């Protein structure tokens, strides 16, 4: 059963990373930030490696989101290894713990000097944690999925 919780956590992490990215894009639209944390980390990594991706800004944005979703997948799986159905408070606390690692460890280690955006980043991580917890519970509540041959009509409420 533990492996199912880990897989659900990984799935929930992907879902939550997308929601978190959307929250950050809304903050950008509102003029609160210039770039998302994954974009800055990707810029720094590409600069250190001397890599300028073909495709320009769009390619850098894509790589930043792919890496961000991988981190979300990993973080969700780690939570699933600890608990199968985390409550919302647990999820938010987990997201804030990840934010502390990001804010106090990762960004300073990469010599990223923030001139704003800490509150946006903290809220985004809290949202991530809440969504991971919600998605893990909802995924666990779904009926069992199984292969369904195409010659058998599927009558389901699907949305």
Ranges and model annotations:
Residues 1-159:
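Short amphipathic, positively biased membrane-proximal segments
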């Amino acid at each position: 059963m533990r492996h199912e919780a880990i897989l659900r956590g990984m799935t929930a992490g992907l879902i939550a990373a997308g929601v978190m990215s959307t929250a950050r894009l809304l903050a950008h639209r509102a003029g609160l930030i210039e770039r998302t944390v994954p974009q800055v980390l990707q810029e720094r990594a590409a600069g250190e490696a001397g890599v300028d991706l073909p495709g320009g800004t769009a390619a850098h944005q894509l790589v930043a989101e792919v890496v961000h979703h991988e981190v979300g997948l990993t973080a969700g799986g780690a939570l699933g290894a600890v608990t199968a159905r985390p409550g919302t408070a647990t999820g938010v606390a987990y997201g804030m713990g990840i934010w502390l690692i990001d804010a106090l460890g990762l960004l300073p280690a990469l010599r990223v000097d923030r001139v704003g955006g800490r509150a946006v980043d903290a809220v985004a991580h809290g949202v991530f944690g809440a969504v991971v917890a919600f998605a893990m519970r909802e995924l666990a509540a779904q009926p069992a999925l199984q292969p369904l041959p195409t010659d058998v009509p599927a009558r389901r409420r699907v949305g």
